[in-house]
C-alpha cells in the first residue's frame, strides 16, 4: 500500500467521526428552531431526534455482516448518495414524518461511515500506533462539535434558515466521497476474507469492555446533556454562561485526545484505563458537589481532558483481545457505545422528572464509578487470561 493511499484512507476515518460529531451536536443546538418550524414543543422534537440515534444504532449493528457482503468503497459511495437524498429531503420536507425519515437515513449513513472509519484504523495500524490514531480519529468528533456550533450560530445570527446547517454537514461527506473514489481498498478485501476463514474466540474481557463502553457513553452524555439546565436551575447561573461549561468540556476533551494520542505509547493501556476512569469519577463528583461557578469551570475542563481517551482506549483494548480483530469485534464495542447514546434521554428524562437534575447527575457519576471498577476487573482478568 502506497503512503498516499494510506493517508487518504486515514483521512476518511478522521472525517467519518467529524460527520457524526457535527450531526449529533448541531441537531441538539437547533432543536428550538426546528420545533418552531414544525410548530411542535421542544420535548416532542427531542423524541423525533431518537430517529437519528436509532439510525446510527441499526447501521452499526448490521454493518458487522454488511462489510462481508458489500465492499467498503461501495458502502461509502452509496452512503454519499443517501446523504444527498436526506439533505434534499430535509430542505424540501414540510411534515415532521418526512423529517424523521430523513434523520433516520442520516443516522444510518453516520453509523455505517463511523464503523468503516474505525475498521480502517484498526487494520491499517497496529500496537501503540493504533491507539494513537484511534484517539486522533475520535478527536475529530469533538473538533466538529466545536466548529459546527460556531458555523450554525453564525447562520442563525444572519437569519439564514436552520436547514443550511445540514447542507454544511453534507459538505463533509462530499470530502469523504472524493477521498473514497481516489483511494484503493484492496487491502481490506483480504482482511475481511481472512476474518471469515478464522473463527474468532472472544474472551470475557470483550464482554466487560462492551459493558464499559455502554455505561461510559451513557454516563458522559447523561451528565453533559443536563449540565446547562443544572447550572441554570440549581446554581441560578445566567443561560449564556452555562454554554461556556459545555464548550469548555468539549474543547478540553479534544485537546486531551491530541495529548493522549502522543503519550499513550509510553504507558500500559490497562493501567491508563484505570487511572483515567478514577480521575474522571472523582472530578465529576467534585463538579456536582461544587457550589462555585468558577470552580465548576475548572473542574469540567479537567473532566473533559481526563475522560477524553477512555472510549478510544476501550476500543483499542478490545482490538487487542484477539490477534486479528474482525469487523464484528470492533462493531460490538461501537454498538454498545451507540446503545449508550440511544438510551441517554430514555433513561435520564424520567429521572429528571421524578427526582430532579441533581440526582440525574449523581446517576451519571455512579455509572462512571462502575466503569472504574470494571477497568480494575478487566486488568486482573487480563493477567489471569494471559492477554498481552
Curated annotation (Swiss-Prot):
Keywords for this protein: Cell membrane, Membrane, Transmembrane, Transmembrane helix
Organism: Buchnera aphidicola subsp. Acyrthosiphon pisum (strain Tuc7)
Transmembrane segments: 11-31, 50-70, 77-97, 101-121, 133-153, 160-180, 206-226, 244-264, 268-288, 298-318, 332-352, 360-380
Compartment(s) of residence: Cell membrane
MF-aspect GO terms: transmembrane transporter activity
Keyword Transmembrane helix among record annotations: yes
Protein's gene: tsgA
GO cellular component terms attached to this protein's record: plasma membrane
Sequence similarity: Belongs to the major facilitator superfamily. TsgA family.
Protein name in the entry: Protein TsgA homolog
Source organism superkingdom: Bacteria
Annotated PANTHER family: L-FUCOSE-PROTON SYMPORTER, PROTEIN TSGA
Topology with respect to the bilayer: Multi-pass membrane protein
Signal peptide region: none
